[in-house]
Amino acid sequence: NKIKKNTKILLSAIKSKRDANFIFTFPGADVGNDVIIQEINKFVKKNNNCFLFKSLGQKNYFSFLKYSSGMIGNSSSGLLEMPYFKKGTINIGERQAGRLYSKSVINVKFNKIEIQKTIEKLLTKKFLRKIQQINSPYGRPGASTKIVRILKRKKIRNIYKKEFFDIDTH
């Protein structure tokens, strides 16, 4: 099973990092999430510097991001939220391929040595200085306020009127 193999590669890569704590959250409803949860559960039971949470809730999640050293995985959160906290992301595999991301994101394959080397890079003073200058490609906070302001200025007419067309089915 590729999902199990990839999960084990990640866990093997971080196992040697005994001087750090690792927080895991349950994966989304993707295919194979049960395998990922099972493997992480086993790993957390054997490694007292690792913790697994089903869900942290938004406030706790953002607090963890703020006080973390970075993110490792293939979550869109690493591409979307982490740049706002000026933290690096190690994006593993192809799951987020094709998405826009900032220079605080380092893409790697599911390879133990590559992941370990990238963890070390993520923590270097040089990389940390570099990402302080980076802005998220997704813009700045406050988009919803701007959208509401623009919509209030626009005159929107006939939004409830639907136009139908007869289609010849013969």
Regions found by a protein language model. Name each.
Residues 1-170:
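Nucleotide-activated sugar donor-binding and catalytic core shared by glycosyltransferases
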